[in-house]
Regions:
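Soluble catalytic regions of large protease machineries
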Residues: 3-169
Length: 169
């Protein structure tokens, strides 16, 4: 799912490796994307592309199996973090515009951040984040449904080879 959704978006980083070989860190496999050039800034569309790609694994489960598993937990966490930063730190919120609603609390250790807003604003932030996640999820589902045959071909090839790298894609 990740590789196909990435490939169908014009500004996604190219996929360099896909594997279904489990790793000791708990990953059941992964899709590796490497940027073609070093990038220091991400546009709003770049961030949405990344979120769509992160949500594509769960979306593929829904399209293929009609169900959900816990396998996408880290992807969902990362997508939610990006969406939250869009709203609270990057000024990319429809509702709040260019307001800095969060600050980095410990930039030298874990990089966690805290909200600088009223409680009702925090609830509104959650709604904005949910909206971004829902739209990106729907976009990923649409791509996978449209290209279902290709999704099945990639999955079949992966089951046979276990790992696909650059030239094979």
């Amino acid at each position: 799912g990740h590789a196909l959704v990435a490939a169908r978006q014009k500004n996604a980083q190219p996929v360099s490796k896909i594997t279904i070989v489990p790793h000791t860190q708990g990953a059941l496999g992964y899709t590796m994307q490497l940027p073609e050039e070093e990038k220091f800034l991400m546009t709003e569309e770049d961030l949405l592309t990344e979120i769509r790609t992160l949500l594509a694994g769960r979306s593929a489960e829904e399209v293929v199996f009609g169900t959900k598993s816990s396998g996408a937990a880290n992807d969902i966490e990362r997508a939610t973090d990006l969406a939250r930063k869009m709203v609270t730190m990057f000024g990319m919120s429809e509702k709040y515009g260019m307001m800095g609603l969060a600050t980095v609390q410990n930039q030298y250790l874990d990089g966690g951040y805290g909200l600088n807003c009223a409680q009702d604003t925090a609830a509104g932030i959650d709604q904005e984040v949910r909206g971004i996640i829902d739209r990106c999820h729907e976009d990923a589902l649409a791509i996978l449904r449209k290209d279902r045959e290709m999704l099945d071909q990639i999955a079949g090839y992966l089951l046979e080879k276990e790992t696909i790298t650059g030239g094979e894609m």
